[in-house]
A protein has these predicted regions:
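Nucleotide-activated donor-dependent transferases that construct or modify glycoconjugates
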Residues: 1-16, 39-40, 60-63, 252-255
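Catalytic binding pocket for nucleotide-activated donors in carbohydrate/polymer assembly enzymes
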Residues: 187-190, 210-212, 342-381
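Conserved catalytic-core segment of nucleotide-activated headgroup transferases in glycan assembly
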Residues: 18-25, 223-314
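A short alpha->beta transition loop at the rim of the catalytic pocket in nucleotide-sugar-dependent
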Residues: 167, 334, 351-353
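Donor nucleotide-activated moiety binding/catalytic core segment of transferases
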Residues: 133, 138, 288-345, 349
């Protein structure tokens, strides 16, 4: 029996991989043993949903980065020579006016343009970085393959480092469309890299120095079930579940969370604009962070949908049922109003008309404006 380690340190991997047919097909093979590596805080809920006779969920301690690991991560973040990182530096300067930090990060970013510097950094990071808490698991299970589902997550990087030392082949994945240009310099190049699209493959080659021969484009696995209309909840049943009338048009509105836009009351402006339209508005609140409406009283044609919420992307969990509800919400909508988020892709999969929020309600600096996010590389054609 072959053993595969699958990382699940980033919360949405449950949606992206574990709930897909790709994972199901692996789990159904009697000649494979799948070991899901997850943080202590989420291991229990993953066991409840995905454990099976040949699928084991192992809890792994994931302490906050410190010491040399923290230094390596900060350096990797600033070495990434992308347009998104330049936007992030400008936005930070607008917020804190720390010119020393801005100039230092600009210098490091300039050095990151040179391939030699990037390769030297990776060599030093591999030599100086830690291996995390998984060494005993390698001894216990002796894996034949590591599938690192987020090659930019610190714990995935540590595991790839450990796998290389143990001679275990590693397949890595770029988890989302913005990761290559917005996270860090790719610290470990796996034996194979899987990506969603040709554009991400090109970015991985340009910014991550990944040889084209080891990159495979696989699409976005969880959209297979989005497009399967047999899995969609019937219209009348769905509308009843969210207290809406199935005879009327539906607008899905997903406001930005306070992780990205603080103290700017965008949702009330949008909802007041929609107050008199001949349609219902389903307001899907963020799954990470909050969208604080204060004492605002929404119009009678608006209904709020509050999915399970988490403080960050490490702790968030989108169960199969919750993901199905999200897909149903988009499928049954006639228009999607959102902002610079992955909801753009989710709505496009269903070929829905999309309106993006591109304004600030109050006058604010670039570093606090919603407009900065539309300057990110992955948002530009």
């Amino acid at each position: 029996m072959k053993t595969i380690f699958i990382t699940c340190f980033t919360g949405l991997i449950g949606r992206n991989i574990l709930s897909t047919d790709a994972f199901r097909l692996l789990a159904e093979r009697p000649d494979l043993r799948l070991i899901i590596l997850a943080p202590d805080s989420r291991a229990r809920i993953l066991r409840e949903e995905y454990a099976a006779p040949n699928t084991i969920v192992e809890a792994v301690a994931t302490p906050a980065l410190g010491g040399m690991d923290k230094f390596i991560w900060v350096l990797a973040t600033n070495l990434l020579p992308s347009g998104t990182r330049r936007v992030q530096r400008r936005a930070k300067l607008a917020r804190d006016r720390n010119y020393f930090d801005f100039v230092a990060s600009e210098v490091v970013g300039f050095l990151g343009r040179f391939r030699f510097v990037r390769w030297l950094f990776r060599w030093c990071a591999s030599a100086a970085g830690s291996y995390g808490e998984c060494a005993p698991l390698f001894e216990r299970y002796r894996p034949d393959l590591l599938f690192a589902t987020d090659v930019y997550a610190p714990d995935d990087v540590k595991l790839m480092r450990l796998a290389r030392e143990r001679g275990v082949r590693a397949i890595g994945m770029v988890r989302s469309w913005d990761n290559v240009t917005s996270k860090t310099l790719l610290m470990m190049i796996p034996d194979q890299l899987v990506v969603n699209t040709r554009r991400i493959a090109d970015e991985a080659a340009a910014y991550g120095d990944v040889p084209a021969r080891i990159i495979t484009e696989v699409g976005i696995p969880h959209y297979d079930r989005y497009r399967d209309e047999r899995l969609r909840t019937p219209r009348r049943e769905f509308f009843a579940s969210v207290r809406l009338r199935d005879s009327r048009k539906l607008i899905l509105f997903t406001p930005p969370s306070d992780r990205y836009l603080k103290r700017d009351p965008v949702p009330p402006v949008v909802l007041d604009t929609l107050r008199d339209v001949p349609a219902q508005v389903l307001v899907r609140m963020p799954i990470v962070g909050k969208a604080d409406l204060g004492d605002y009283v929404p119009p009678p044609n608006a209904v709020f949908d509050a999915p399970s919420n988490s403080p960050d992307f490490q702790e968030v969990h989108l169960s199969r049922a919750a993901d199905r509800h999200l897909a149903d919400s988009i499928f049954h909508s006639d228009l999607v109003i959102t902002w610079a988020s992955t909801m753009i892709i989710d709505a496009a999969v269903f070929d829905k008309p999309i309106i993006l929020i591109g304004f600030d309600v109050t006058s604010r600096s670039y570093g606090e404006s919603i407009l900065q996010y539309y300057d990110y590389d992955h948002q530009r054609a």
